[in-house]
From Swiss-Prot:
InterPro entries: Ribosomal_bL34, Ribosomal_bL34_CS
Keyword match Ribosomal protein: yes
UniProt keyword list: Ribonucleoprotein, Ribosomal protein
Entry's transmembrane regions: none
Gene3D superfamilies the UniProt entry points to: 1.10.287.3980
Gene name of the record: rpmH
Organism, scientific name: Mycobacterium marinum (strain ATCC BAA-535 / M)
NCBIfam families with a match to the protein in the record: rpmH_bact
Ribonucleoprotein in keyword set: yes
UniProt-recorded name of the protein: Large ribosomal subunit protein bL34
Residue stretches in coiled coil: none
Cross-referenced Pfam families: Ribosomal_L34 (PF00468)
GO molecular-function terms, A-Z: structural constituent of ribosome
Superkingdom assignment: Bacteria
GO BP annotation list: translation
Phylogenetic placement of the source organism: Bacteria, Bacillati, Actinomycetota, Actinomycetes, Mycobacteriales
Length: 47
């Protein structure tokens, strides 16, 4: 059985653009995510 290729191809720029802090701050829902993570005491708020 042939398996497909690995789907995770790391790329720091894309990671930041898709999950980064500036993207989160753009929308109300994104700000809510960051607020919730701050309240919970997460070490990393965003990627």
């Amino acid at each position: 059985m042939a398996k497909g290729k690995r789907t995770f191809q790391p790329n720091n720029r894309r990671r930041a653009r898709v999950h980064g802090f500036r993207l989160r701050m753009r929308t109300r829902a994104g700000r809510a995510i960051v607020t919730g993570r701050r309240r919970k005491g997460r070490r990393a708020l965003t990627a």
